[in-house]
Amino acid sequence: MSHRPERVAEAIKKEVADLIRNDIKDPRIGFVTITGVEVTRDLSFAKIFISVMGSDAHRQETLSILQKSAGYMRSEIGRRIKLRHAPELIFKLDTSLDHGTRIAEILHEINSQEAKPTHE
């Protein structure tokens, strides 16, 4: 079995991060972290999972801006990685960090409740 999709996914992750940091000049884009990239076996689609700091409205706005600039990023990726056909980019919000933060908060609450001495 080939590891090419995994290598392409890593290259796409690196290039998209560089494009967001240096080429996309929209001030509405906040602090964006690319948490992962999944590429189909035939390299026709690439799901790019992002985490965005801020409110839900800000996250949706950032996602919309990135999706609108996906065509430009696709052409740049095709040029930089030298693929015959650059995959179509699909941006998705990664909420796993939010879930992890919420679980940590719940565990902290439980620990602080158990640490309180009970008066019996």
Swiss-Prot record:
This is Ribosome-binding factor A. One of several proteins that assist in the late maturation steps of the functional core of the 30S ribosomal subunit. Associates with free 30S ribosomal subunits (but not with 30S subunits that are part of 70S ribosomes or polysomes). Required for efficient processing of 16S rRNA. May interact with the 5'-terminal helix region of 16S rRNA. Belongs to the RbfA family. HAMAP family: RbfA. Keywords: Cytoplasm, Ribosome biogenesis. The keyword Cytoplasm applies. The gene is rbfA. GO terms for cellular component: cytosol. GO terms for molecular function: ribosomal small subunit binding. Monomer. Binds 30S ribosomal subunits, but not 50S ribosomal subunits or 70S ribosomes.
